[in-house]
Amino acid sequence: MSAAKPKVAKKARVAPAHPPSSQMVVAAVTALKERGGSSTQAIKKYIAANYTVDMTKQGPFIRRALVKGVASGALVQTKGKGASGSFKLGKKKEGKSDAQKARIAAKKAKLAAKKKEQREKKALKTKARKEKVAAKKAAKKATKKTKKVKKPAAKKAKKPAAKKPAAKKPAAKKAKKPAKKVAKPAKKAAAKPAKKAAKPAKKAAKPAKKAAKPAKK
């Protein structure tokens, strides 16, 4: 087995001898209180006098802190450009009061409600338009269906109407034929007995002629 390696004691982190460069720059400008702004040289002197720093090494960090301070609004550059010139503290943005916050919140809520109302109205209009179009389409379909249904109904109604008058003709013929048949036997029955009654009368006359012959002798 290999021997356990001895644990190396971690070096205690050395606390920095000075705060960050941005804090030192702001502290210097605040303490100097120059009306026209504090120069870069004056700020460096204040930091060197009040903090334990190596100005040779810290110089670039101070210049960077000045540029960043102007960009963020913590500092205002009154003269010069970049890290050179004069600097003073920027105006602190005052926190909005509760009344202002309430007004802003109410304004936002009102705008949101208005937008919502507009969206709802728009949605209702589009819905109504769609319903109207759908109703028109449905009405057109209904009219087409009714037209299709009406055509067969008209044909069916016409055919039975034409057949009904034809049914009346057989009824009229049946009534006339029996009347003719009844009339013919009546004529024959009346005529035949009359002829038969006349024949015996002729036969009765013949004997009278025979009786006259003896008178000639």
From Swiss-Prot:
Q: Where is the H15 domain?
A: 17-91
Question: Can the keyword Glycoprotein be found in this entry's annotation?
Answer: no
Question: SUPFAM superfamilies in the record, alphabetically?
Answer: Winged helix' DNA-binding domain
| Matching CDD domains | H15
Pfam families of this UniProt entry?
Answer: Linker_histone
Question: Basic and acidic residues compositional bias: what residue ranges?
Answer: 114-123
Gene3D superfamilies noted in UniProt: Winged helix-like DNA-binding domain superfamily/Winged helix DNA-binding domain
* Location of this chain's protein in the cell: Nucleus; Chromosome
Could you cite one Gene Ontology molecular function of this protein? Answer: double-stranded DNA binding
GO biological process annotation, one example = chromosome condensation
What keywords sit in the KW lines? Chromosome, DNA-binding, Nucleus
Q: Which residue windows does the record flag with biased composition (Basic residues)?
A: 104-113, 124-217
Q: Where is this region: Disordered?
A: 1-21, 80-217
Using the UniProt record, give the first listed, main subcellular location.
Answer: nucleus
Q: May I have one GO cellular component term? A: nucleosome
According to its UniProt entry, the function of this protein is described as: Histones H1 are necessary for the condensation of nucleosome chains into higher-order structures.
Q: Which family does it belong to?
A: Belongs to the histone H1/H5 family.
Identify this protein by name.
Answer: Histone H1-gamma, late
> What organism is the protein native to?
Strongylocentrotus purpuratus (Purple sea urchin)
